[in-house]
């Protein structure tokens, strides 16, 4: 009897497991009315989306050499060409302020970067390492490791839906008297918006999985030349979901 009961429960669980979906978005982790999340999203609207990855690159050769900088340039271009990547910022994009040596009044008209043939790489190395703007952000203290920021494309529809949801929630929470018809309409709109947001989250989750995989494949091409690591919120969320999905498959069989 006990074995029959266990078998029945296993069958029921297995049927429901196929419909189980994981949501790694912030919506699944906080309440709809969370003020901190709202403030965070308002900052994103003002200053831009914060979806990005960080690539650290430590070449086997001298970082500030023409060969290493050429490899970084190639990697940067390869990453830019990946669908889903909006832009890439690297040490090559960092302006060199005092190469060649000019007066402070002329600095703005003479900004160059490491790709400029007039720049002395040895002097540029010292300037970048000792620049508080760059230090421990795009360059390590010892000048051997640099970082690249891979900015991911946002989803305009998602942002619009989030804003619409906040507007509805504010109306429902306001002290302004609302008719039953208006309340029902707002609640219906809210339900439709939440459904669409969930759909987008699922689509984005699958897309990010493929995106992270393609970025890793691109980085693998350069691993013979350097020690490379990938990090960032999107990668962590994607990897966590894959670990959980793997556990569900194992424990669900």
Give residue spans per PLM region.
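Signature of alpha-helical transmembrane segments and their immediate interfacial
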Residues: 1-22
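Extracytoplasmic
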Residues: 41, 45, 115-253
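Short, hydrophobic beta-strand segments
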Residues: 52-61, 105-111, 146-154, 195-198
């Amino acid at each position: 009897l006990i074995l029959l009961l266990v078998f029945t429960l296993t069958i029921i669980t297995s049927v429901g497991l196929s419909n189980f979906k994981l949501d790694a978005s912030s919506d699944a982790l906080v309440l709809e009315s969370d003020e901190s999340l709202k403030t965070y999203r308002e900052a994103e609207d003002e200053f831009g989306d914060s979806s990005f990855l960080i690539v650290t690159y430590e070449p086997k050769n001298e970082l500030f050499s023409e060969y290493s900088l050429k490899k970084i340039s190639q990697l940067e271009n390869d990453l830019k060409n990946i669908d889903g990547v909006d832009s890439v910022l690297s040490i090559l994009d960092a302006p060199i302020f005092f190469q060649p040596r000019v007066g402070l009044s002329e600095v703005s008209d003479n900004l160059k970067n490491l790709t400029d043939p007039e720049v002395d790489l040895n002097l540029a190395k010292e300037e970048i390492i000792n620049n508080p703007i760059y230090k421990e952000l795009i360059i390590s203290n010892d000048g051997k490791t640099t970082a690249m920021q891979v900015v991911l494309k946002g989803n305009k529809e998602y942002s619009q839906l989030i804003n619409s949801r906040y507007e509805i929630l504010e109306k429902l929470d306001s002290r302004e008297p609302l008719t039953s018809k208006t309340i029902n309409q707002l609640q219906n709109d809210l339900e439709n918006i939440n459904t669409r947001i969930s759909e987008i989250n699922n689509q984005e989750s699958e897309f990010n999985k493929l995106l992270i995989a393609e970025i890793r494949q691109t980085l693998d091409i350069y691993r013979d030349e350097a020690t490379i690591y990938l990090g960032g919120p999107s990668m962590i969320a994607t990897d966590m979901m894959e670990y959980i999905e793997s556990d569900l498959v194992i424990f669900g069989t």
